[in-house]
Amino acid sequence: MISVKGLWKVFGSDAEKVIGSPLADLTRPELRAQTGNTIAVRDVSFDVAPGEVFVVMGLSGSGKSTLVRCMTRLIEPTAGSLTFEGEDILQVNTARLRELRKTRFSMVFQHFGLLPHRNVIDNIAYSLEINGVKKAERHARANEVIELVGCRDFQTPIPNSFQVACSSA
């Protein structure tokens, strides 16, 4: 179970002073003009049950990426609580956080990057490689994914060619 309760991310100095004060009720431009701060995530709460598919949707600039980055602690929330399978994610140490990111958390970045010195198969199989999966298995699994998304003809070109060719697939 993932549980997010009262999660806030305020960018700027003295961000904590915004939460629970009349400043939190200001519009974005008003808050920015008065304090220099920006509220990116405002008092978000939800639970995701095991096996449940949960989608974060919203307009551009509404805080979706910031919310997910807070959930994975790529950026630190300003306030709130975040638990995963009963564990307080905001209290885990760096080693535990790294392990959770490696084995339990994932996100697809809005502007992802390919490793230009690797071919398409090796880019796709990279996460398997850093998790210690042998090369033959990595490539077999990467080929399954390539077949699944209909990009079999783009397995070996340089990544930029793959990105352009498969973006319309």
Question: For each predicted feature, which ranges?
Answer:
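Conserved ABC ATPase "signature" region
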Residues: 20-30, 85-88, 129-132, 136-154
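ABC ATPase NBD coupling module
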Residues: 31-38, 90-106, 130, 135-139
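The feature captures the beta-strand-to-loop junction immediately N-terminal to the Walker
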Residues: 57-59
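Helix-to-loop junction immediately C-terminal to a conserved catalytic motif
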Residues: 72
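Short coil-to-helix segment of the ABC ATPase nucleotide-binding domain corresponding to the Q-loop/switch region
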Residues: 117-125, 158
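Conserved ABC ATPase signature
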Residues: 158-166
